[in-house]
């Protein structure tokens, strides 16, 4: 049986957990500099870019999420790792007390996010993210507003 020599803090699961808990949940963008490679390749719709621009897009997303839902918390409900890749299914909950495609709704949100990341040396080098934006729009009442 092989021995895993990777430090617990650099394993893909721990890197992903930290980006959610220390970044998105708190609004602290400094975690991006620590956990995302300078050459990050970001594929997520609305954030897609490479290098410094990709890292700035992730920082902006952290600020936007935290501004819209300051009490947000994340729970990794499922994950799978293969080589340097990790897939996670994350549950995000909170209250939309900040602006999100319109004025604050003050409604609770509970959405799922699927992420795939490639992690090397404790840093995210490539990322694909699929947050359930439709559920978010519906739960905050923005979908009804847009349908009018």
Stretches with model-predicted labels:
Residues 1-148:
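C-terminal and inter-domain tail/linker signature
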């Amino acid at each position: 049986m092989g021995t895993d020599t990777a430090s617990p803090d650099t394993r893909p699961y721990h890197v992903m957990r930290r980006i959610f808990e220390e970044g998105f949940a708190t609004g602290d963008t400094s975690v991006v500099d620590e956990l995302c490679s300078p050459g990050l390749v970001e594929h997520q719709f609305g954030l897609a870019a490479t290098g410094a621009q990709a890292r700035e897009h992730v920082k902006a997303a952290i600020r936007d999420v935290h501004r819209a839902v300051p009490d947000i918390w994340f729970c990794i409900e499922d994950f799978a790792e293969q080589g340097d890749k990790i897939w996670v299914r994350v549950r995000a909950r909170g209250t939309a007390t900040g602006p999100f495609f319109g004025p604050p709704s003050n409604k609770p949100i509970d959405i799922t996010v699927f992420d795939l990341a490639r992690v090397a040396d404790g840093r995210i080098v490539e990322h694909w993210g699929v947050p359930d934006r439709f559920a978010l729009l519906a739960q905050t009442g923005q979908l009804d507003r847009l349908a009018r």
